[in-house]
Amino acid sequence: NDGSGSVFQSNSLANPHTWREEFTKKININNSKDIGKFDVVVTNPPFGTKIPIDDPVILEQFEIAYIWEKSENGFTKTTRLQKSVPPEILFIERCLQLLREGGRMAIVLPDAILGAPGLKYLRYWILKNVQVLASIDLHKDTFQPKNGTQTSVLLLRKKTKKEKEMEDAKSTIRKYPTFMAMVEHVGHDKRGNLTFKRDEKGNEKVISQKEMVKEESKGKIVEKEIETKTKITDDETTEISLIFKEWKKEQKERYSEYDF
């Protein structure tokens, strides 16, 4: 990329002052506290315990890279850095840093982040800083045949400074509705082979379409109507996105005090 398309490549976990100059100058970035320039972040970050981040220069940029201790109202950050942190955890905070107040993020994360007992402090931090708009549990074959990790997509909205101050004053986190769904069909199996929808008898469903084509007949070009049949990929992700849009409309009408 020559930069004209505003696409840049850098180690996004490194300190922002080390990012490529044409990028940092374009949006006036100086440090990790000065990167909230974006309205939307969509990401599928690398994850796994085999690629931990252990550079203290990188870790010290992130609140969730520190050790957190259980407290009366949740968890409290200490001044002690963890020895290493999986990259997906750091990417949650980095993406949040990149957002403006009220900005939205869609991020793919391993399910351990949502349920592992040792990561309660992380879930506490997430709920303190964002409104969870949706949690969508993906099928285990979603990234097969390359990766079988069980993952979810989280849709998040960055809370404003005012929102967080109000919650801190009451020592509570506001309750709000969250869209939840499970994707049971993703259009392929664990080997990567396409899967198709079937009827109650097990026959593959098809869509019949008529179209006009041109062909040569007796030295002349004539138009002819033909019927084509196309199998329907068994993928629920598009359907769930449409259901989510309808859900959002309903929530805006019912809960005007929340930003969906």
PLM feature segments, named:
Residues 1-4:
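Short, conserved SAM-binding/catalytic segment
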Residues 6-9, 134:
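Short, well-structured beta-strand/strand-turn elements
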Residues 9-15:
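Conserved SAM/SAH-binding loop
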Residues 15, 19-260:
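A conserved structural/catalytic subdomain of Rossmann-like adenosyl-cofactor enzymes
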